[in-house]
């Protein structure tokens, strides 16, 4: 039967020469996604008049808090995987530790919460408008998530119900997420691949909507929440998820996806009502960044005016000089 093979455990870690530790493929892929998102977000912000490199100042706050939020959410929804008799909670190097984030186990909804707090702090620090940054980040974040799903592939996680489709995913028999009683060789829905495709399509949709309707004031990020939440709600409904919390028979991640859609709709309609026009500046009032190149151009213009006035025998800055200046003609 045709299927998608999963990489073996040797692919999960990359050995380094002259170093006792190994790089986790999951962590490396997440890092690539962060770098790609940072570069694209920086480019989008710079085009709006923001200071080049300001995204790095904000990410210094957002990335660590996003990682903490992602891990905290995962541990909170899978407590039996981490809290059991004999577990050493304070050893970060013990396999299965709550601190071993390089082994996988991070929830995007927790990352969004932690990252949003970090962005708020970073925007207060730099003077950038929160919604300006969120809008610039939205498609880049979705692209980073698409890249990050490859990490789930190498860790053999984020797969769905059994299937006989030709693109069914092979999962090692020892995977603890596989339900008891399934025969060896069972294939599963490759949810990581479905989400990658959904996210990439979403990148194009978000960019097109922003250009077509000139969306600002957080409405681009609202579209991101609606798009991602809608797709994730379906994928979670067919996912084999060992999370332990449900409400009305619905897993916690499905509720979180519904919440993302509702929050996106609220942001979109509230911001459309409050801010029907365009943003006056990417910065908050009184915190605007002045481009040094613009100051140089302004100084050059002043010097040209002074030279023209001297050539006419009129003191620079006088009323006569202003009257004879070509810029006032």
What name fits each language-model region?
Residues 1-329:
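A feature for loop-to-transmembrane-helix boundaries and adjacent hydrophobic helices
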């Amino acid at each position: 039967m045709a299927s998608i093979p999963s990489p073996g455990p040797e692919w999960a870690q990359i050995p380094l020469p002259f170093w006792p530790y190994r790089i986790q493929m999951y962590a490396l892929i997440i890092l690539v996604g962060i770098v790609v998102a940072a570069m694209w977000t920086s480019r989008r912000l710079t085009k709006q008049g923001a200071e080049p490199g300001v995204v790095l100042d904000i990410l210094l706050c957002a990335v660590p808090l996003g990682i903490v939020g992602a891990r905290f959410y995962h541990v909170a929804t899978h407590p039996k995987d981490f809290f059991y008799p004999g577990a050493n909670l304070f050893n970060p190097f013990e396999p299965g530790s709550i601190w071993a984030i390089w082994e996988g186990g991070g929830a995007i909804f927790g990352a969004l919460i932690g990252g949003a707090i970090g962005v708020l702090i970073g925007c207060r620090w730099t003077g950038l408008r929160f919604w300006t940054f969120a809008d610039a980040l939205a498609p880049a974040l979705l692209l980073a998530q698409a890249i990050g799903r490859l990490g789930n592939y190498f860790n053999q996680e984020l797969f769905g119900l059994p299937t006989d489709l030709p693109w069914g995913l092979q999962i090692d028999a020892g995977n603890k997420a596989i339900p008891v009683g399934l025969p060896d060789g069972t294939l599963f829905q490759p949810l990581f691949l479905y989400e990658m495709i959904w996210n990439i399509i979403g990148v194009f949709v978000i960019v097109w909507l922003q250009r077509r309707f000139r969306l600002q004031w957080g409405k681009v990020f609202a579209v991101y929440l609606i798009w991602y939440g809608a797709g994730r709600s379906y994928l979670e409904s067919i996912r084999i998820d060992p999370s332990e919390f449900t409400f009305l028979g619905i897993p916690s991640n499905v509720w979180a996806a519904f919440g993302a859609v509702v929050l996106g709709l609220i942001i979109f309609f509230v911001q459309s009502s409050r801010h029907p026009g365009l943003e006056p500046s990417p910065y908050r009032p009184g915190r605007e960044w002045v481009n040094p190149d613009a100051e140089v151009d302004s100084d050059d213009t002043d010097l040209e005016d002074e030279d023209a006035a001297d050539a006419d025998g009129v003191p620079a800055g006088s009323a006569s000089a202003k009257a004879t200046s070509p810029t006032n003609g």
